[in-house]
Amino acid sequence: MKIILVDAVFCFVSDKGQIFKEMHILLETYINKKIILTGANDEQFKTFGLDKIPYEVFTLKHNPEKTDPKYYEMMLEHFNLDKNDVIYFEHNIDAVKSAQSVGINTYFYDDSKKYLGELKKFLDENI
């Protein structure tokens, strides 16, 4: 069963630390494990409310950033996962390209639209 990797800020939570309720409801329809990915440092972790969300959170504290393929290589190694074990959605197009460059099936989520229909389709087709 594939693990769903979720971009933290602007996908699952706002920059004010509010959980995007509709996103949470959508994710809860899947029994798959979810891991929230972020680059947040300790201060940002609290600011964004990442210490209060219902899923495991992975961060490398901006070293490297998610726009660097090394971030995803290190994340996969940390969890002892293969690129084929996961699917991912992310709001930053450069981070999307970075994840794709290491072979992770990744969806660009346009956080300005907050439209979940296409994301649900991606999840349904790739889990």
Q: Language model features by range: what are they?
A:
Residues N32-I35, K83-V86, N105:
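Short active-site oxyanion
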Residues E73-H78, E118-I127:
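Short amphipathic alpha-helix with an adjacent loop that forms part of the alpha/beta core around
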Residues I87-K120:
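Acidic, Mg2+-coordinating phosphoryl-transfer loop and its flanking beta/alpha structural elements
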Residues Y30, D51-I53, V102-I104:
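Short, structured coil segments at secondary-structure junctions
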Residues D42-N84:
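Substrate-recognition "cap/lid" segment bordering the active-site pocket of phosphatases
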